[in-house]
């Protein structure tokens, strides 16, 4: 029997999503489509009669307006062009070494990278690690290691207090929570493509185990097409 309910949503399409670029910790804004997706997400939540006490998000604009993995040296690169250069199996397939490998990080973001100074000196990260310890990349495994303590130490206690919670975050951060809740294998989570701007619901029992998993607030065909669009981002043109 479900005791707790929590709603999550991946941020709406960003300008860099629209350009098919690896975004990571770069503060890309929402695209016009992303703005529409955020509005549609709000409408879907209202139509489902959801009301929230607390909303959790990341420091980045695209999540605030609707937690992202750090794509290191891939930041700003076109996903399809990267697939062309390194091979599709390195970028976005079940055996992907870069964007969809569970424990192998992408190449590091070196100091001479185009976006290094923009990200490392971003005031949003002022409470983060010092520059000499600033992460230069993240694998999905490292992303989960960064986000799960927040789930366990902050969100779980709030659920126990009876708070109604919405998480508006990033694809990889949310995949980490989904992997944890549904006990997915490394291979299974690599196959999961979370659509932008479509809220999904988890109903949890008293032990925070799913009674209902990833119930999207959208019609099945729309969700399917949105997932396919995400999956296609790493395909060679």
Regions found by a protein language model. Give the residues of each.
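Active-site-adjacent alpha-helix immediately C-terminal to a catalytic or transition-state-stabilizing loop
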Residues: 64, 134, 138-141, 145-210
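Short coil/turn segments at secondary-structure boundaries
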Residues: 20-21, 180, 215-216
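Active-site-proximal alpha-helix that buttresses catalytic centers in soluble enzyme cores
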Residues: 2-68, 80, 84-87, 135-147, ...
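Short amphipathic alpha-helical segments with coiled-coil-like heptad repeat character
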Residues: 42-43, 88-94, 151-153, 210-212
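Pan-eukaryotic secretory-pathway lumenal catalytic ectodomains of glycan-active enzymes
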Residues: 206-237
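Phosphate-handling substructures
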Residues: 68-146, 193, 215
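Glycine-rich, phosphate-binding/catalytic loops in enzymes
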Residues: 24-26, 77, 182-186
């Amino acid at each position: 029997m479900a005791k707790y309910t929590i709603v999550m949503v991946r941020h709406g399409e960003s300008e860099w999503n629209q350009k098919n670029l690896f975004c990571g910790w770069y503060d890309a804004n929402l695209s016009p489509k992303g703005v529409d997706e955020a509005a549609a997400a709000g409408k879907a939540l209202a139509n489902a009669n959801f009301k929230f006490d607390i909303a959790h998000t990341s420091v980045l604009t695209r999540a605030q307006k609707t937690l992202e993995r750090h794509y290191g040296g891939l930041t700003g690169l076109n996903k399809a062009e990267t697939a062309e250069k390194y091979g599709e199996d390195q970028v976005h397939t079940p055996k992907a070494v870069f964007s969809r490998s569970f424990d192998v990080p992408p190449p590091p973001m070196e100091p001479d990278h185009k976006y290094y100074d923009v990200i490392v000196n971003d005031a949003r990260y002022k409470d983060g690690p010092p520059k000499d310890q600033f992460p230069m990349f993240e694998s999905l495994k490292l992303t989960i290691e960064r986000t799960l303590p927040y789930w366990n130490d902050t969100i779980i206690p709030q659920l126990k207090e009876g708070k109604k919670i919405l998480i508006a975050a990033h694809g990889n951060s949310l995949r980490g929570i989904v992997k944890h809740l549904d006990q997915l294998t490394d291979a299974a989570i690599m196959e999961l493509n979370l659509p932008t701007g479509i809220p999904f619901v988890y109903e949890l029992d008293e032990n925070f185990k799913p009674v209902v998993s990833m119930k999207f607030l959208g019609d099945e065909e729309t969700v399917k097409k949105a997932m396919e669009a995400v999956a296609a981002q790493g395909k060679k043109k």
